Design a protein with these regions (language model features):
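A detector of single, family-specific signature residues
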Residues: 1-386
Length: 386
């Protein structure tokens, strides 16, 4: 039996993974050659590598495919990549859709491994490329900051409720205030570590400084977007980037019925969350290209929040453009019809929020309600490159 492609899948769990070795024949049939379970550990990885080597044909393309299951796939993917294997990592929703297309009614690890191997044999997919250790650490820190900020917001809400309840528990209030102080200290420590991580890489530091010349875009925003996109390494167009972030528009039309269009939100939620406050700032601080977009959409009767989401998307593409071109913000270049203005630049330091001291009193738009405790960008705190 001649075959033209080899596909090995790994359906990964916390402690073990199910593997399936399949081949695509010259008649374009997918045939399973072997299956086995391995421990999700260095010893299991070594056994898996030997198992694959015994069965593969070195003259035929081989791909190892796995699902992005939390963090559990990372060690195996990294080990195989270091060994020179072609690794493909697919999102869970894509894998699920493919399994459904095969007509499988049951679900278990063995069947999932077979379906993944079938997918790897049938389809041509982009190989997985790990991000640099610097960006990997930066992503960990920015996500930790987001989580601690959310916990801080929850504590503030609980403290507010407790202080206004009929029978106030003084000991509860005291504990909540201590917890709030702890979260605030943690946020400051994480912010300093983010700055130190960026400063440790001169090239990364220089490029992030250029990105933060956009008024309203601070260090935390830039760091989060750069880390979540792996420095835009895998993107060749703005369309790819906006789709990855979930800003692509989904139509809802059938026959004569025309439903509302909306963004898919099937993308990286960390990017969308971090861009919320910068979009408000960019409009209120009159960044011309953002302010013009906001006014054009609201002038057409669009809801204000819809316009702000459009500004978020615009900011993301601007950051992408500045990063790829390795240049700072130039107002007349990106909106020539607007008069030249005095664009904020970062000299000795970069503001966490992207808002200068002179502009802090104008950050909150008159049309927006105060939501300072609901977002991971605390306006007013400074985080500088040292």
């Amino acid at each position: 039996m001649k075959f033209i492609k080899q596909s090995v899948s790994a359906d990964i769990a916390k402690d073990k993974f199910d593997a399936c070795f399949s081949v695509l024949t010259s008649e374009h049939r997918v045939v399973v050659k072997a299956t086995r379970k391995f421990a999700n550990s260095p010893k299991g990885f070594a056994e898996f590598a030997q198992w694959v080597s015994k069965r593969e044909d070195s003259q035929v393309e081989l791909v190892v495919i796995m699902e992005a299951t939390g963090v559990y796939y990372e060690n195996l993917a990294w080990t195989l990549h270091q060994a020179g294997r072609k690794v493909v990592v697919v999102l869970p929703n894509r894998a699920k859709q493919y399994v459904q297309s095969l007509g499988h009614k049951s679900k278990n690890d063995r069947l999932d491994a077979r379906a993944l191997a079938h997918m790897g044999a049938e389809r041509d997919m982009e190989p997985w490329r790990p991000m640099s250790q610097q960006l990997f650490l930066l992503r960990k820190l920015t996500r930790e900051h987001e989580q601690v900020q959310q916990m801080r917001t929850e504590v503030i809400s609980r403290l507010h409720a407790e202080c206004h309840s009929m029978l106030q528990g003084k000991s509860t209030v005291r504990r909540l205030r201590k917890t709030l102080q702890l979260h605030e200290a943690q946020l400051q420590a994480i912010q300093l570590e983010i700055a130190e991580t960026i400063q440790a890489d001169p090239l990364l530091s220089d490029k992030i400084k250029k990105v933060t010349t956009i008024k309203g875009v601070g260090l935390l925003t830039a760091a989060t977007i750069v880390a979540e996109t792996s420095g835009f390494a895998l993107f060749t167009s703005q369309k790819q980037l906006t789709s990855y972030a979930g800003y692509d528009v989904v139509e809802n039309q059938s026959g004569k019925r025309s439903g509302k269009e909306k963004i898919s939100k099937q993308g990286n939620s960390h990017i969308r969350r971090i861009l919320h406050m910068p979009a408000l700032n960019a409009v209120s601080l009159n960044v011309p290209v953002c302010r013009a977009l906001y006014e054009r959409l609201t002038g057409k009767g669009k809801k204000k929040m819809v316009a702000y989401v459009a500004v978020q998307k615009k900011l993301l593409t601007l950051i992408y453009t500045l990063w790829k071109k390795d240049e700072g913000w130039q107002q007349d270049h990106y909106m020539r019809q607007e008069p030249k203005g005095d664009i904020q630049s970062l000299e000795a330091g970069a503001s966490l929020s992207g808002v200068s001291a002179a502009d802090k009193n104008t950050v909150a738009p008159a049309v927006a309600r105060a939501t300072q405790d609901e977002h991971p960008v605390p306006v007013g705190q400074e985080l500088s490159f040292r």
